[in-house]
Design a protein with these regions (language model features):
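Hydrophobic alpha-helical transmembrane segments of multi-pass membrane transport/permease proteins
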Residues: 20-45, 67-77, 180-189
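Selective transmembrane-helix segments that form parts of the transport pathway or gating/packing helices
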Residues: 23, 27, 73, 102-133
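Hydrophobic helix-coil surface modules that form long, contiguous segments used
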Residues: 24-40, 265-271, 446-663, 672-730
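Terminal transmembrane helical anchor/hairpin motif
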Residues: 42-57, 174-253, 275-292
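Long, hydrophobic alpha-helical segments
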Residues: 61-87, 122, 323, 383
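N-terminal, polar/Ser/Thr-rich
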Residues: 199-208, 216-225, 253-319, 347, ...
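A surface-exposed beta-strand-loop module
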Residues: 332-335, 342-407, 445-448, 480, ...
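Extended, low-hydrophobicity, Ser/Thr/Pro/Gly-biased non-transmembrane segments
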Residues: 384-501
Length: 754
């Protein structure tokens, strides 16, 4: 018999024995029953609360199901895989193979393949059941079923089966093997979790695996490398098992090649593990380098740019841009400092038709204008560059532990990205420094880098065929497919999003309100069919409520909610409450609002009718309530609330800032206060206007202390500056700054009789 046919013969025999096992049969029945019931609740039952993050993004359905199945089969595989060695020895179940001229490799691989293929068949059955239910939604991501099967189930099964059999041969004790492996599983799931950058997460619980319906996976290299660790380690244990197997080999030297192969495979697994850690640590190192370079150039001469002319041409793999800046010299010099994302390559810089010399130091661009310009002189320069954005340059002020913290919604682990660039999608926000800006980015030595100015922006964009660009200002398209944008007012920054967008819009008080969604992502229009004429009135109420509360009016002629990939992440800064999710005139909202249960609008309308009880409400009223709940999200200062167990059985409540809070639209994008001595001056004004230091009595009832009381206690023990630099107090930073702002303005309020 050939090598393959021998393996198939052994595998066939082993598979039959495994299928006849009552242990496996019980697990199969339980798995099928539980998964079927879960799918029924998810797709069919109207009494369930809904699970919008799973159904909004079709790829999340196989992700969730296989993750749940993976937990059970990883435990069961330990018992069943290690059992065949005990069974062979105790019951002589494989004597028929021992007398045949089989190599140890054929026998061991056949045994393991026999176990593995039964589990893989169970996975296929579970996926088929899930896909059948999934078809009721009308939107199935078939590729996601295959990818998650290969990324979650296959590496886990190969690793745990190979490790179990290897330990059985080494320890020669099944009970001890069970104890060690079950302890290992418990340790990785409940204690280690995502520690050490989720290196030990062999079941893929902490690995960011959410696949966007817009850009797909945003961290392919991390995923393949991480799953490769356990796939290769599992193969290495299988090869070690062949060389250690207690059976006379066909040749006295036949074990040596397998030892060499096993060591080489194990080394490859270690290399993948090393690369996983190294790539993450490299991000921290390069970020420190970028900050160090900013510190070096933060005090060099720069200019105030009051006019930008930008031209962007989208390519499948990158983008080409030509930017002309015009401004005023703030210092007397011939060389001025600019900052541009280090992933972008500058091809030329010229002014008035003359090529200018420039020096590039990572993100810093030093442009030599040839002659010295006096302070106040008008200067212009044109930059031509292309490339891809380096995301590691973003958020240099955010501590590594915050950047590396998991972004988890239930069991769904979402990657965090700050820009996107694929053949069908492009998203660039100001944080990426996708166009040259005067001075440097974040410096931890000198706050002068924070000083920003309002500039006039004109933007021309040539997208790929069939795609629509979005930016600040009204977009106009010419006959050649080039879009032009010009803002109504000077702005501090500019953003650009290009995708296969469609628009739903309504006018209210001469302002154009729009929802820009990706093609085939309009799941909400039908749920508001009874209130199309009422929506402008509801929007007007939200706008007026925002103006009444903060005594500031919305200044722009447009407001858009733009659908972006779910992996897009932002952070609150020490000097401003504005996050990248909120841009002038627009909010960048996760695809289909997947992370918010309020966005399951179809179910929400039904729930409002069902929950009305004796006070029956009309379909129109239910739709109005659903719309109002959605709009309310943009008026809340807090985002997620997290409940945890405290000491002596008390609960503990913590909250994070709402990244979609609209306050920056009426304050940050129209006003800016800067002080080199008080870098948080602008933040203090924000929080003073919001009266952040008030209205938290209900938190005291849960925590025993409100966040303001906690902040007061901290201010008694530490200085204001120390608390701003303390990463552990980030959740209380608003309260700390708000209390200081209230104290700062208290005397003025008394003098004015406020």
């Amino acid at each position: 018999m050939t090598f393959i046919s021998n393996i198939q013969s052994v595998a066939k025999y082993e598979s039959k024995l495994l299928i006849r096992s009552w242990f496996f049969r019980v697990f199969t029945v339980l798995a099928v029953t539980i998964i079927t019931f879960f799918n029924f609740q998810l797709f069919v039952s109207e009494d369930s609360g809904g699970f919008w993050i799973a159904t909004a993004i079709p790829s999340n359905i196989p992700y969730l199901i296989l993750l749940l199945l993976n937990t059970g089969q990883a435990v069961i595989a330990i018992f069943l895989a290690s059992d065949f060695l005990k069974r062979d020895k105790k019951l002589d179940t494989s004597e028929v193979f021992y007398v045949r001229p089989l190599s140890n490799a054929e026998y061991v691989i056949g045994k393991i393949w026999g176990n593995l293929r039964v589990f893989l068949l169970l996975n296929l059955i579970i996926m088929a059941i899930t896909a059948a239910f999934n078809l009721t939604l009308g939107e199935v991501d078939w590729m996601a079923y295959l990818l998650y099967f290969l990324l979650i189930s296959v590496p886990t099964l190969i690793f745990i089966i190979g490790l179990a059999i290897f330990l059985m041969l080494v320890l020669k004790n099944q009970a001890l093997t069970f104890v060690l492996l079950l302890g290992y599983i418990g340790l990785t799931v409940f204690y280690i979790e995502d520690k050490l950058y989720y290196l030990f997460d062999y079941m893929a619980y902490s690995l960011p695996l959410v696949k966007s319906s817009i850009v797909g996976f945003s961290n392919w290299e991390v995923i393949l490398n991480h799953r490769g660790i356990y796939f290769l380690a599992g193969l290495a244990f299988v090869f070690f098992t062949i060389s250690l197997f207690r059976r006379l080999p066909n040749s006295s030297h036949s074990n040596y090649p397998w030892l060499v192969i096993s060591f080489c495979t194990l080394m490859l697994a270690f290399v993948c593990g090393y690369w996983h850690i190294h790539s993450i640590l490299y991000q921290s190192d390069i970020r420190a380098t970028y900050t160090k370079i900013n510190n070096q150039y933060v005090s060099t001469p720069k200019m105030f740019i009051h006019e930008y002319d930008l031209s962007v041409e989208q390519h499948p793999e990158d983008f080409l841009s030509e930017v002309t800046v015009k401004g005023v010299a703030l210092d007397s010099s011939a060389v001025f400092t600019f900052c541009l994302n280090p992933g972008l390559t500058i091809h030329s810089v010229h002014s008035a038709g003359q090529q200018l010399k420039f020096k590039r130091d990572k993100q810093i661009v030093l442009v030599d204008f040839g002659t010295k310009h006096a302070k106040g002189d008008t200067i212009s320069a044109t930059f031509r560059y292309d490339g891809q954005i380096d995301n590691s340059f973003c958020y240099l002020d955010i501590p590594p532990e915050v950047l590396q913290a998991s972004n988890k919604k239930f069991l769904f682990n979402i990657d965090k990205q700050y820009s996107f660039q694929t053949k069908n999608y492009l998203m660039l926000t100001p944080e990426t420094y996708w166009y040259p800006r005067a001075g440097t980015s974040y410096s931890d030595k000198n706050p002068d880098w924070q000083q920003t100015y309002f500039s006039n922006y004109r933007l021309k964009v040539k997208p790929l065929p069939g795609l629509v660009p979005l930016s600040q200002g009204e977009g106009k398209c010419d006959e050649e497919g080039v879009y032009s944008f010009k803002g109504d007012y000077p702005s501090q920054t500019l953003s650009l999003v290009i995708g296969d967008y469609q628009q739903k819009s309504a006018y209210a008080d001469s302002i154009l309100y729009s929802v820009w969604h990706l093609r085939d992502h309009d799941y909400f229009t039908a749920s508001f069919d009874s209130i199309h004429d009422t929506i402008p009135w509801l929007i007007r109420n939200v706008k007026e409520q925002l103006a009444r509360q903060y005594k500031l009016d919305y200044p722009f002629k447009r407001f858009s909610i733009v659908e972006v990939p779910v992996q897009f992440a932002s952070y609150e800064r020490a000097w401003s409450q504005a996050q990248e999710t909120v841009q002038p005139e627009m909010v960048l909202f996760p695809e289909k609002g997947a992370i918010f249960w309020e966005l399951d609008v179809k179910r929400q309308v039904k729930n409002h009718i069902r929950w009305s009880g004796n006070n029956e409400i009309s379909l129109q009223e239910a739709q109005m309530r659903t719309f109002s709940n959605f709009a309310w999200m943009f008026l809340q200062t807090e985002g997620d609330y997290n409940f945890s167990s405290g000491s002596r059985g008390r609960g503990n409540l913590s909250s994070t800032a709402n990244p979609y809070f609209l306050f920056p639209q009426i304050y940050n994008f129209r006003y800016n206060i800067y002080s080199s001595e008080w870098p948080v001056a602008n933040r203090a004004i924000e929080l003073y206007l919001q009266k952040k230091s008030e209205n938290e009595g209900w938190e005291r009832q849960i925590n025993g202390l409100s966040n303001n009381e906690k902040a007061n206690l901290l201010l008694e023990k530490h200085t204001f500056k120390e608390l701003l630099a303390d990463v552990e107090q980030r959740n209380l930073q608003n309260n700390i700054v708000g209390l200081e702002a209230s104290r700062l303005f208290a005397r003025s309020e008394i003098n004015m009789g406020v």
